[in-house]
Amino acid sequence: MYKNNHANHSNHLENHDLDNFSKTGYSNSRLSGNFFTTPQPELSFDAMTIVGNLNKTNAKKLSDFMSTEPQIRLWDILQTKFKAKALQEKVYIEYDKVKADSWDRRNMRVEFNPNKLTHEEMLWLKQNIIDYMEDDGFTRLDLAFDFEDDLSDYYAMTDKAVKKTIFYGRNGKPETKYFGVRDSDRFIRIYNKKQERKDNADVEVMSEHLWRVEIELKRDMVDYWNDCFDDLHILKPDWTTPEKVKEQAMVYLLLNEEGTWGKLERHAKYKYKQLIKEISPIDLTELMKSTLKENEKQLQKQIDFWQREFRFWK
């Protein structure tokens, strides 16, 4: 459908718009009520899933194109389904009409990390794969904030009652924190990105610290990507601040023994969550909100780019 027009479309590309698809840069920020020595985080969409429907004609066209295209590896091929990886395994594609009809859902899915695609690869994917789909939309968006700071020194909590899981590193400090469960509409991960890169890819990060706050949004929550973590707090509470020794002791216990929260009644949980917020001079989520606000238009352009009606060359 679009594969012969790739070069022509590329010539019309407004490079400054696509360049703005890159992650946001670092800068120092000061917010009212919070004195930040932490640099502004680098912000990006780190994962996307787009689903849509292939009609019979487009399914045949796409299958024919994919079977001869050298940048695509196909398997599990039948008349009503196929699986594929494209662009050096950076994109996963799945089509299954029978399963979609029986489960009453859309029949094609495309998964990728836009940070790993070049501008040319983005155009190729949109024009040769995604534009074949009808009734397409996002079912997953991952919003990633990368901090050049040691977030193990911070205390993370949510106002909502969600499951919290913590994994500790060899030094005894928190290395990964999960809020929620993986199959929920929102799943928050806070982890040591520098250590993760070293462990998984043996890649050495030059920064002294690199931590990521990643918010995985699915299904209906993708529509709220620009307002999805109001209940999250990443704090540096000073447990010695409360005047009452009993409150000091309780706050210290809650900060250092996560299991203690489960022993509190509902009103006590609310009281101490409020107190912990009050005794923290810093809440990094305020920095995250300001970063998101500053970059909201460019992030929206990324979303618009993948939608059928959007064209850079207009």
From Swiss-Prot:
Which InterPro entries did the record assign? REP-like_C, RepD-like_N
Q: Which Pfam families match?
A: Rep_trans, RepD-like_N
Gene Ontology process terms (BP): DNA replication
Identify the keywords attached in UniProt to this record, alphabetized: DNA replication, Plasmid
- Relay the record's extra comment: The nicking site of REP proteins is sequence, but not plasmid, specific.
Give the family this protein belongs to, as stated in its UniProt record: Belongs to the plasmid replication initiation factor family.
Per the entry, what this protein does is: This protein is probably a specific topoisomerase involved in initiating replication. This protein is specifically required and may be rate-limiting for replication of the plasmid in vivo.
In Swiss-Prot or TrEMBL terms, this protein is called Replication initiation protein
Record the organism. Staphylococcus aureus
The protein's gene is named: rep
